Swiss-Prot record:
<dbReference type="GO" id="GO:0006212">
    <property type="term" value="P:uracil catabolic process"/>
</dbReference>
<dbReference type="GO" id="GO:0042602">
    <property type="term" value="F:riboflavin reductase (NADPH) activity"/>
</dbReference>
<keyword id="KW-0520">NAD</keyword>
<dbReference type="InterPro" id="IPR012349">
    <property type="entry name" value="Split_barrel_FMN-bd"/>
</dbReference>
<dbReference type="GO" id="GO:0052874">
    <property type="term" value="F:FMN reductase (NADH) activity"/>
</dbReference>
<keyword id="KW-0285">Flavoprotein</keyword>
<dbReference type="GO" id="GO:0010181">
    <property type="term" value="F:FMN binding"/>
</dbReference>
<keyword id="KW-0560">Oxidoreductase</keyword>
<dbReference type="Pfam" id="PF01613">
    <property type="entry name" value="Flavin_Reduct"/>
</dbReference>
<keyword id="KW-0288">FMN</keyword>
<dbReference type="InterPro" id="IPR019917">
    <property type="entry name" value="RutF"/>
</dbReference>
<dbReference type="GO" id="GO:0008752">
    <property type="term" value="F:FMN reductase [NAD(P)H] activity"/>
</dbReference>
<comment type="function">
    <text>Catalyzes the reduction of FMN to FMNH2 which is used to reduce pyrimidine by RutA via the Rut pathway.</text>
</comment>
<comment type="similarity">
    <text>Belongs to the non-flavoprotein flavin reductase family. RutF subfamily.</text>
</comment>
<dbReference type="InterPro" id="IPR050268">
    <property type="entry name" value="NADH-dep_flavin_reductase"/>
</dbReference>
<dbReference type="GO" id="GO:0019740">
    <property type="term" value="P:nitrogen utilization"/>
</dbReference>
<protein>
    <recommendedName>
        <fullName>FMN reductase (NADH) RutF</fullName>
        <ecNumber>1.5.1.42</ecNumber>
    </recommendedName>
</protein>
Length: 164
């Protein structure tokens, strides 16, 4: 069997564009957040998303204990916030850089996000270095911004909604 090496896999994955998201939580284990593009729809009955999280990440224990999260899909122009949540910046500095509301699950919702999905984690599957978090959506909040943000070919790109 031919196994693809890690660098070849990563180079190939850079060809797949994906929305840029900040995943947040708040609860008994505290408040935390990270940037992720490994997020996708699973089903609409019941409305469910999946989020992939490295078990070695500093935020993993917080999400694992809180069992709630909010997927905040970023708009064009929010690249600095994505970089902040994707780095080693202390949590209080990450959250201080934007305005937040509290969602129905208690998780922080980014006020200027393109869309926010407030969720409960209902199943976790471990694969390799990551946990796949299956998340039932309890509430959705949309913002009227016309521009989305995607990560493609190792850089950010703005997307504009088509005129109807």
């Amino acid at each position: 069997m031919n196994i693809v090496d890690q660098q070849t896999f990563r180079d190939a994955m850079s060809c797949m564009g994906a929305a840029v998201n900040i995943i947040t939580t708040d609860g008994p284990a505290g408040r935390a957040g990270f940037t992720a593009s490994a997020v996708c729809s699973v089903t609409d009955t019941p409305p469910t998303l999946l989020v992939c999280l490295n078990r070695g990440a500093s935020v993993w224990p917080v999400f694992n204990e809180n069992r709630t999260l909010c997927v905040n899909t970023l708009s064009a122009g929010q690249e600095p916030l994505s970089n902040l949540f994707g780095g080693k910046t202390p949590m209080e500095h990450r959250f201080a850089a934007a305005r937040w509301q509290t969602g129905v699950t208690g998780c922080p919702q980014l006020e200027e996000a393109l869309v926010s999905f407030d969720c409960r984690i209902n199943q976790v599957v471990s694969v390799g270095t990551h946990d796949i978090l299956f998340c039932t959506i309890e509430a959705i909040h949309r913002h009227a911004t016309p521009y989305g943000l995607v990560w493609f070919d190792r850089s950010y790109h703005a997307l504009m909604r088509p005129a109807c």
